[in-house]
């Protein structure tokens, strides 16, 4: 298998506007062949989604979900560029899927950028202390820490979480698929989860 270099990832990003991890995965799946990787990204709708990601989303709807036992409720603000899309049944279905994800997986934040710096530092300190307690040396800790932080982010940030119905994709991937399908930008603006007797 050919090596996936940072130069190849950079070139693919420049040519498709797709995210770094999407480009890396596309190259890995296609033996570092950039043309095949572009086709792969297009088939997945990622290249198209990335080009639309900068567009403003002023329309949308609030989608709600109450879990079967009546003890968990979720509200999600899902935005689109036009009301034509936000009134679509498939858009509503996407909102329901995201609500069920939140009910099931209880994310604390929307995305990595919404984690307060103090909270992230606190987690890093805890992780560092755990690794020290396991007898890891300082240089080992610095190599292990980024992976542990990435795992933490994938657990607590909605868009980074594995989709509960198909863990081969994230919620971000689910939204990108919808962007490709509808042909316009879609964003999750915010969410709130209620639980009887909980926070």
Curated annotation (Swiss-Prot):
It is found in: Cytoplasm. CDD domains: UBA_EF-Ts (cd14275). GO terms for cellular component: cytoplasm. It comes from the Bacteria. GO terms for molecular function: translation elongation factor activity. Residues 82-85 are annotated as: Involved in Mg(2+) ion dislocation from EF-Tu. It holds the Pfam family EF_TS. Associates with the EF-Tu.GDP complex and induces the exchange of GDP to GTP. It remains bound to the aminoacyl-tRNA.EF-Tu.GTP complex up to the GTP hydrolysis stage on the ribosome. Belongs to the EF-Ts family. This is Elongation factor Ts. It comes from Leptospira interrogans serogroup Icterohaemorrhagiae serovar copenhageni (strain Fiocruz L1-130).
């Amino acid at each position: 298998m050919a090596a996936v270099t940072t130069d190849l990832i950079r070139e693919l990003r420049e040519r498709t506007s797709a995210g770094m991890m999407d480009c890396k995965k596309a190259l890995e799946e296609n033996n570092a062949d950039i043309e095949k990787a572009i086709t792969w990204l297009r088939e997945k709708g990622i290249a198209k989604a990335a080009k639309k990601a900068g567009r403003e989303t002023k329309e949308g709807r609030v989608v709600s979900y109450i879990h079967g036992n009546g003890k968990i409720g979720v509200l999600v603000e899902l935005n689109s560029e036009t009301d034509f899309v936000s009134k679509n049944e498939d858009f509503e279905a996407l909102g329901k899927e995201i609500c069920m994800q939140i009910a099931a997986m209880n994310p604390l934040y929307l995305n990595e950028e919404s984690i307060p710096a103090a909270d992230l530092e606190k987690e890093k300190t805890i992780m560092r202390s755990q690794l020290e307690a396991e007898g890891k040396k300082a240089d080992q800790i610095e190599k292990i820490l980024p992976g542990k932080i990435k795992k933490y982010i994938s657990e607590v940030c909605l868009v980074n979480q594995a989709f509960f119905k198909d863990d081969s994709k994230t919620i971000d991937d689910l939204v990108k698929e919808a962007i490709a399908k509808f042909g316009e930008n879609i964003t999750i603006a915010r969410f709130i989860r209620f639980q009887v007797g909980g926070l």
